[in-house]
Amino acid sequence: MAVIALDTPQGGARVHLHPAAHPIAALMLGHGAGGGVAARDLTAATKVAVDAGVSVALVEQPYRVMGRRSPPRAPVLDAAWTSIVEQLAAGELAGLPLIVGGRSAGARVACRTAAATGAIAVLCLAFPLVSPSGVSRQEELDDASVSVLVVQGASDRFGIPEPDPERSRSVVVVRGDHGLKSDPIAVGDAIAAWLMVVLAQIG
């Protein structure tokens, strides 16, 4: 594992790069609003992806590198993320088909920017379908026009998205809440099965 510092227009970002031995694709994952890249579901995703031949980049947004817990507005997050994707795609992850994703707020960023980053698929861990004030974020999820996997806790207080075969969106519900800490094995199994399908399509 290597830690890479990157500059973005929004400040310095940090990337934890877990390279596969013989990578056939890359997976970039963002953290939740107040959390970090050591979240249990991100750890599970990293392990199964690397085992499947996918190099993983866990991205710390600039505001977290600065020590802040509260995220900036969506356009700021999206701009920083897009800058990081572009730099990695031209550098450490050059030539690899790109899968993007994240947990909670990181999943929202990945969905909103999927088209701009040229992602072939999106992995959403604990996608917050409804905001704390009750506002639906369905449109953000629908913005991702590629294959999408949502892994959601059965008791997630922010709701559970519906699968949509027409949009190539599948949803796997596992034991637990928004933290997805209760059953990391089930989380990993769901991701591994989905990755097999995604990777077969680019093979």
Locate each region found by the language model.
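Serine-hydrolase catalytic machinery in alpha/beta-hydrolase-like enzymes
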Residues: 4-97, 109, 173
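Catalytic histidine-centered segment of alpha/beta-hydrolase-like enzymes
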Residues: 176-189
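Hydrolases whose catalytic domains are alpha/beta-hydrolase-1, hotdog thioesterase
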Residues: 109-113, 133
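Short beta-strand immediately N-terminal to the catalytic nucleophile in serine-hydrolase-like folds
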Residues: 97-102, 125
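A conserved short beta-strand
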Residues: 118-131
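Conserved alpha/beta-hydrolase "acid-adjacent" motif
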Residues: 37, 153, 157-162
